[in-house]
């Protein structure tokens, strides 16, 4: 059941998380309300933060103020806080208050640009995991040259056994159906080769669990050199490998895009030729890899929707993270995960 106020989807916002908070959060909420709300969906915000910083922004962004309720918090989680410290000592933080709002039924999901480790630790402590889920995983949508795919885990679990990887694959498949709008997503395990004998015990064990599992379109192994080809819809790895893979891909894409811009736009002749011949195609390609529209990572397997936006998110990035949360809620993602793993003993 959706958490609503007057039939609105309710999202809790951590106004103090991120490099550019609280402006990025409040402005982002306004951008979302102005540009990204789907027809027929109404969204209401519970906003948590420091009143001295947030209140002036709410006066400026009237539409956000009119569609929200603000609660003052005397503390906030810092970027360099260890998860254990944040859990024990940041008890009146905006991050924890937003998560507690989900626990108490005031909101259905949280969006935060704050400390990832602290967000996971507090969320897991306050909300717990869904039935039959051993560990939550961080999932995100990544671009390729032809389409997008879901990648998990992105850092929640550095070491994973076969059972955890198996569950990540099940959750990732359900996540992809909603996020990518694919009826039967193809799922693969990231490995150092495609032969069944390759990989460590956890990966090979997960392969055995998945190859005959019902309700999942498992395609075996995929190597890192293949993931940008766009042939697989869900790629599963442990949190260490997945995080390294994602950050390497992001850095490579950023470097490549900057090189193109430098080479093309340093010459007025090149600018003119690009404008005439390639502008629309180049813009389309650059948009596909634009991190601002892919700002949300989802914590799958928790008893509530938790979206982690990039720490350096600006207003547009944060707005897209809010949209990510609203889509997950409106599609009833967690109930579908519960149904999808109900056969696990």
UniProtKB/Swiss-Prot annotation:
It is found in: Cytoplasm. Pathway: Lipid metabolism; phospholipid metabolism. It is an enzyme of class 2 (transferase). Its EC number is 2.3.1.274. Belongs to the PlsX family. Catalyzes the reversible formation of acyl-phosphate (acyl-PO(4)) from acyl-[acyl-carrier-protein] (acyl-ACP). This enzyme utilizes acyl-ACP as fatty acyl donor, but not acyl-CoA. This is Phosphate acyltransferase. The lineage of its organism: Bacteria, Pseudomonadati, Pseudomonadota, Alphaproteobacteria, Rickettsiales. The gene is plsX.
